[in-house]
Amino acid sequence: SPFVAAVWPGKALFPDMLNKEAREWFGNKYQFLLDQGVEGFWNDMNEPAIFYTEDRLKDVLEELDRFKGQNLDMDKYYEFNGLVRSLSNNTEDYKVFYHNMNGEKIRHDRVHNLFGYNMTRAAGEAFERLEPDKRILMFSRSSYIGMHRYGGIWQGDNKSWWSHILL
C-alpha cells in the first residue's frame, strides 16, 4: 500500500525510487518543464524528509494530552518539546516504508541513502532520453556514491558565510 507522510505541502505519497518503472514515470514528469524551456533543476527534501505520519501524529497527540492544564516547568517543557520534535524524520516511520526492487520488498531504513540517489538517477536518465543533445543542470540535496553521473551535489541549507564555504 502507498506510504503517506507529510512534508511541505501536507500529506504526500512517495514514489518508489528503487523500482525501475517508478523511476521512469518520475523522470518523465520533467518533460512538461523541459517543454517550457527550463534547463536547470534542484531536487530537494529527497533524503526523503518526513515531517510526520498519521500514526505517529496520533500517538504524539495522545501523549501531549497529559500536559493539558499543567504549568510546565523546564523539565516538562523539554519533554513536551521532545515529543513534538520526535515527529520529524522519526526512524520508526522509515521502518514501515517499503520499496519494491526487482520483486523484492525492502524496508526503507535499510536503503535510505539510495532514495535520493535514485531520484536524481531518474531525472538524469530522463534528461538523456528526453533531451539527448542538451546538457541539463541538476542539483540534488541527497546523494550517494556515483550520483555525480546524474547531477551535482548540493550541500544543504548553507549561508553565504566564509565558514560555510569551508564545508
Predicted regions span which residues?
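Catalytic-domain carbohydrate-binding cleft regions of carbohydrate-active enzymes
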Residues: S1-L167
